[in-house]
């Protein structure tokens, strides 16, 4: 009976070591992938989306105040540029081979972009846009991914 207990303990320890080793290997692989992938297109897309939201809010505020101020925007070229940034962003995120690594990429974008936010509202817009990206890119919501690592 003692031999069986020792054998079970050894097998459990071996499983733990293998699992830990695989996790470390996965983390190292993700770090390498994040160093190789260029997330600039994702950052640009997010910047454009937040700017667009702010412009829409300003337009609504003007309308509520009764100011008839027409803003001429070059929608077609702007939308085309946004679409191109989004397509390239999705390609970059799809290059990452796991949801955990994709989550790390979104967290990395949040960390770099949140420094430029002016207030909590912009941070929330940033979080919201980053949370939408996986669905927009077609690989669904990321499970257990907290975009803002400070809130963990």
Swiss-Prot record:
Disulfide bonds join 30-101, 42-89, 90-137, 90-137, 103-145. One of its GO terms (molecular function) is nutrient reservoir activity. Its main location: endoplasmic reticulum. Keywords: Allergen, Disulfide bond, Endoplasmic reticulum, Signal. SUPFAM superfamilies: Bifunctional inhibitor/lipid-transfer protein/seed storage 2S albumin (SSF47699). It is found in: Endoplasmic reticulum. Residues 1-22 form the signal peptide. Heterodimer of a small chain and a large chain; disulfide-linked. This is Conglutin delta 1. It comes from Lupinus angustifolius.
């Amino acid at each position: 009976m003692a031999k069986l207990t020792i054998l079970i303990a050894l097998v459990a320890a071996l499983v733990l070591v293998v699992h830990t080793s695989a996790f470390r290997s996965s983390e190292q692989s993700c770090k390498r992938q994040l160093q190789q992938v260029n997330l600039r297109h994702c950052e640009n897309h997010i910047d454009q989306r937040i700017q667009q939201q702010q412009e829409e809010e300003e337009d609504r505020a003007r309308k509520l105040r009764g100011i008839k101020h027409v803003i001429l925007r070059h929608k077609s070229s702007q939308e085309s540029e946004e679409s191109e940034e989004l397509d390239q962003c999705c390609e970059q995120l799809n290059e990452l081979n796991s949801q955990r690594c994709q989550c790390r990429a979104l967290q990395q974008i949040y960390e770099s972009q949140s420094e430029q936010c002016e207030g909590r509202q912009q941070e929330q817009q940033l979080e919201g846009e980053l949370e939408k990206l996986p669905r927009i890119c077609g690989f669904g919501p990321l499970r257990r991914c907290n975009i803002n690592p400070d809130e963990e």
